[in-house]
Structure formats: C-alpha cells, structure tokens
Amino acid sequence: MNSYETVNDVLVKLFNEIMDVEERALITSEYKDISVNDMHVIEAIGIREPKNMSTVARAVSVTVGTLTIAINHLVKKGYVERTRSEEDRRVVLVSLSEKGEKAFLHHKIFHEKMVMTVLDGLNPKETEDLTRALLKLQNFFDSYGNKEKN
C-alpha cells in the first residue's frame, strides 16, 4: 500500500471511529435523550455568556433555521434556555441550563481524555508535526466548505 492509500484509509477509518467512539462515550444513560449533534450544539453555546443564534449556527456550520429546530428540542429537554436580548428584543439569545452545563462538561472531559491519549507518548517534535498536519487538514476542510457555500 502506498502513502496515498494509507493516508486515505487512515482518514476514513479515523473519521468513522471518532464518530462511533464519541457517540458511545457521550450518549450515556444520563444523556440518552440527546444526540452527538445536540452535544455539539451544547458545546457551541458554551458555559459563558448567552450567545445569539447566528453565532451558534456558524460554530456548528448550520443555518439558523436548522439550529432553531435543534434548540427547540434542547429547550424542551431542559438543556438550553432561550431569552431575548435586552438591547434588541428581536435578537434571541441561548444559554445552557444547569443540566446543559453538566452535559457540556461531560463532553469537554471526553475531548480532554481523547487529546491526552493521542499526545501521550509523543515527543515534542512528534506533537509539533502532528499539530501541523492536523492544521493543514483543517485548512483543507475549511477551504472546501467555503467553496461549497459560494
């Protein structure tokens, strides 16, 4: 197998395995009422100040309309709270409830463990090389996504 085939196989397997492992790790009995996509919306909202819908939609790469559907479900399930901006009542702000903050931390801990496991045993040069390669991959996806939108 040449380098191209190896990289292609690794990328496909990694993508599928990360999605599978993330789903099994995140959707525990406590969080069985939400999906991995819901967890990503929760992550995008974050635990700081409330965010407007456009900001969250951009962070998860969906339209505001698509996000509205997800937010409606998360509000009903008690993970997200929706309010109006005091400055501009037309602006809808979303923030995490206590239940949502717990889910956020659960997701954050999973990612911390995943990253630490990947970096464990790598020397500084290997860590730098991996970081550089992953940034190039991210740049490809960012530019590919931007071409698709135009």
State where each predicted segment sits.
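N-terminal positioning helix adjacent to the helix-turn-helix/winged-helix DNA-binding module
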Residues: 7-10, 37, 99, 126
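Helix-turn-helix DNA-binding motif, specifically the short coil turn and the N-cap/start of the second
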Residues: 63-66, 70
